[in-house]
Amino acid sequence: SAYRFSYHEQGSPDKEPTSGHTLIMGRPGSGKSVLSAFLMTQARRAGARVFVFDYRSGMEMAVRANGGRYASLNAGQPTGLNPLWTETDARGTAWLSDWLATLLYRADKPLTPAQTNRIQEVVRQNAQASNPALRNWRDFASLFVSTDDGGDLHQRLLEWTEDGRYGWIFGQSLEDTFSLKGDVVGFDLTGILDSEADKERMAVLSYLFRRVEREIEDRRP
């Protein structure tokens, strides 16, 4: 007989979908990836859209076998990500302001209220730019030069421009070219997850989760 499996708690058709509550645990080599691949393939029978955050390419074959797209993100190599390009509507600017405040945080020198307000102002300027080509990290950083903080915010932003130490993450492309199009999308994050730099991991993962969140919120097929 058929076994009716669901990843979610029971919901209602006239309400928001319930969150997923399925967790697979096991020791190395016990078949977690195989089971995940099987469940993913079965979910596709019902038309589910799948995003795979992969480690050591454990799901690559399953993603490709399901006709999906698969890409790798590696530390030190351009990612094609650029939140300045994508987060330009009302929801996006609110998220981007909070995210940048976290990204630029330093335990030894927390942001002042004036700096936080300045971030919000510049994010709005970025969203309203008449020329989309200005939505790059170097031009974005230049908007902080006039901030009355001794150049502190400007210097912090320069680390994320194309020539900065974190420039490989967001500073190498204008348009956000990291595509989530398709019913099955997988990306290998081994190089990011194995990175010893917490800030790099946080930057990449938090923005990737945001991109997926927007896809779900907007009900993009």
Give the positions of each predicted feature.
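P-loop NTPase motor domains
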Residues: 1-2, 64-68, 75, 82-221
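Glycine-rich phosphate-binding loop of nucleotide-binding enzymes
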Residues: 2-75
